[in-house]
């Protein structure tokens, strides 16, 4: 009978211990979330560590250990950034639901890929069965500034709809790399041929203009789009658009202007992007040696 | 005499023995009771302590939640955040470590992740089809003294050597990105084939992969055209090894009537533009609604 009297307490103890465990986990999460929202705090904590005395010896040892861990993680992350082209600046993972064989997590991630910033909110479902574990994305929201790039914004909404998080990262990485390549190429030509090459919308824009300094009325527009297809493959598409006054077009009996675009495409196939633009400038702009050597 | 003596001895001694046993049992019982009471008291105290701890935690969580709400409010108002009250520097550092570790784990979801090793790097390439994460592949790449793959789990039909020859020495990032495209497309095709096998046998049958790269796939499926059942044979060709959708879908049927041929051409574009299981779901639901409407037409006809 005495034993029976003990039971209610034991049950309650077990329940309480379980509840405390769960609450501790929740506490950690809200703590992380609060910290995530006030990211300034990380910096404060780090700064105050570097600049001040810590009275307690024990604590100093702990803190030093933590600092070493932070340093390790940062190095490892830097290494991964170089491999994948993706850089994460803020991250928060929260448990939404947990049971014996499955768990739902909510993630918030802020990061960038070259000059493209992104913010993601997504949920993952991890389920375990007897012989395997699986993971899937069950909800995906992407916030990105891509008004100027219609291809990218179309891709983003397609990826959201299909919850293809992995493809988003991979395609974004190669898209950003192509953007960087385009920017560098444009800037390099502008530097090499300052009189012939124009970048009216800046080096990051989709086009650059070519003109012959001796004949400013005629202009060629090199349009360089970076297309992302349905399956996430990134393909650069270059086009040549002549901007020639009507009078000049009337004089063009052999259809040079009309054939310019297809001619340029052939050129691309043979010489590649860089070589084609170079040859185009040389021939169209008829540059004197002085300009070319600048 | 002897008999009386033994009787007397037994009587008194057994009585004493009984008394002794009684007192012993009583002592044991008392001790046991005392212990149980003590345990009970201890448990009572523990319960109180745990309750207190729980309530404290709850309060702390509430406080942080309120804080988060406040931050959200300020975030919306576009103000700069202050510092979270009541979190020590030590705790902040711990959280920082947690966040960084989370970021490291997060890389697994991006397709290319890895860990540095003594000689180089151990890369993990993960694959996914739409939201579902599929197989991962690992490569041990030595960077010093020279770049080379020491071990890997990439299937033999993926042209790893060729990709390595083209990019590994010059650009590790490019190498991984090309290899990823091959592996992800292969995993995606394999996944669709597995999905195909889970359709009921009455609808889809004889599903067969043409090769281990899963670039050729054949199966038969049943449809109803003008209320008549037909069996169509489909052959899907995946022309690009870095693609997970077919480049060509050849569908054949023994019957040549125009309505069947029409169906065939619509299915062919459906297969080329959609994941296989999605396309088949679409075909089967189309069929069902047709059957339903024809059944109801039949019904009205009868009455």
Curated annotation (Swiss-Prot), chain B:
Q: Does the keyword Nucleus apply?
A: yes
Which GO cellular component terms are attached? kinetochore; nucleus
UniProtKB keywords: Centromere, Chromosome, Coiled coil, Nucleus
One Pfam family per UniProt: CENP-O
Q: Which positions carry the signal peptide feature in this UniProt record?
A: none
What compartments host this protein? Nucleus; Chromosome, Centromere
* Tagged with keyword Nucleus: yes
Mostly located where? nucleus
From the UniProt record, list the coiled-coil ranges.
38-77
**GO biological process, any:** centromere complex assembly
Function per UniProt: Probable component of a centromeric complex involved in assembly of kinetochore proteins, mitotic progression and chromosome segregation.
Family (UniProt): Belongs to the CENP-O/MCM21 family.
Name of the molecule in the record: Centromere protein O
Gene of this entry: cenpo
């Amino acid at each position: 009978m005495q034993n029976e009297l003990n039971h209610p307490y034991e049950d309650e103890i077990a329940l309480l211990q379980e509840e405390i465990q769960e609450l501790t986990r929740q506490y950690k999460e809200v703590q992380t979330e609060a910290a995530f929202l006030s990211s300034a705090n990380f910096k404060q904590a780090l700064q105050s560590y570097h600049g001040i005395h810590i009275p307690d010896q024990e604590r100093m040892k702990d803190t030093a250990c933590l600092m070493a861990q932070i340093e390790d993680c940062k190095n490892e992350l830097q290494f991964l950034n170089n491999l994948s082209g993706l850089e994460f600046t803020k991250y928060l993972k929260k448990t939404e639901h947990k049971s014996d064989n499955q768990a739902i997590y909510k993630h918030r991630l802020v990061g960038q890929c070259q000059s493209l910033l992104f913010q993601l909110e997504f949920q993952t479902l991890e389920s375990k069965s007897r012989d395997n574990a699986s993971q899937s994305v069950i909800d995906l929201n992407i916030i990105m500034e891509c008004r100027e790039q219609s291809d990218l914004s179309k891709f983003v909404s397609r990826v959201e709809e299909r919850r293809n998080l992995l493809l988003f990262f991979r395609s974004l990485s190669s898209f950003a790399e192509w953007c960087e390549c385009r920017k560098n190429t444009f800037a390099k030509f502008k530097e090499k041929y300052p009189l012939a090459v124009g970048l009216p919308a800046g080096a990051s824009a989709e086009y650059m203009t070519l003109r012959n300094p001796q004949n400013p009325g005629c202009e060629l527009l090199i349009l360089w789009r970076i297309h992302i297809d349905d399956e996430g493959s990134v393909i650069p598409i270059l086009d040549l658009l002549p901007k020639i006054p009507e009078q000049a077009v009337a004089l063009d009996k052999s259809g040079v202007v009309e054939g310019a675009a297809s001619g340029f495409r052939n050129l691309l196939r043979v010489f590649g992007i860089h070589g084609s633009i170079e040859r185009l400038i040389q021939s169209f702009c008829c540059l004197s040696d002085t300009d070319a050597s600048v | 005499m002897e008999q009386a003596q033994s009787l007397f001895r037994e009587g008194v001694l057994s009585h004493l023995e009984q008394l002794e046993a009684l007192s012993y049992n009583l002592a044991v019982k008392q001790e046991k009771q005392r212990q149980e009471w003590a345990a009970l008291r201890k448990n009572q105290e523990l319960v109180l302590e745990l309750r207190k701890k729980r309530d404290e935690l709850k309060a702390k969580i509430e406080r942080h939640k309120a804080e988060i709400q406040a931050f959200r409010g300020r975030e919306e108002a576009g103000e700069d955040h202050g510092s979270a009250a009541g979190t020590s520097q030590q705790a902040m550092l711990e959280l920082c470590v947690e966040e960084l570790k989370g970021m490291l784990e997060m890389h697994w979801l991006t397709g290319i992740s890895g860990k540095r090793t003594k000689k180089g790097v151990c890369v993990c390439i993960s694959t996914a089809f739409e939201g579902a994460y599929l197989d991962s592949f690992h490569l041990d790449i030595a960077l010093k003294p020279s770049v080379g793959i020491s071990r890997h789990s990439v299937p033999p039909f993926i042209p790893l050597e060729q990709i390595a020859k083209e990019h590994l020495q010059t650009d590790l990032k490019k190498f991984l990105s090309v290899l990823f495209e091959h592996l992800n497309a292969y995993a995606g095709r394999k996944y669709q084939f597995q999905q195909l096998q889970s359709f009921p046998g009455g609808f889809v049958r004889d599903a067969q992969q043409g090769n281990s790269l899963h670039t050729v796939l054949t199966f038969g499926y049943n449809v109803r055209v003008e209320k008549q059942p037909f069996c169509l044979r489909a052959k899907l060709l995946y022309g690009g090894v870095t693609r997970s959708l077919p480049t060509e879908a050849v569908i054949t049927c023994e019957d040549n009537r125009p309505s069947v041929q029409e169906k065939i051409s619509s299915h062919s574009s459906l297969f080329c533009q959609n994941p296989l299981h999605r396309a088949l779901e679409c075909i089967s639901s189309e069929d069902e609604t047709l059957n339903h409407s024809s059944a109801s037409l039949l019904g009205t006809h009868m009455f």
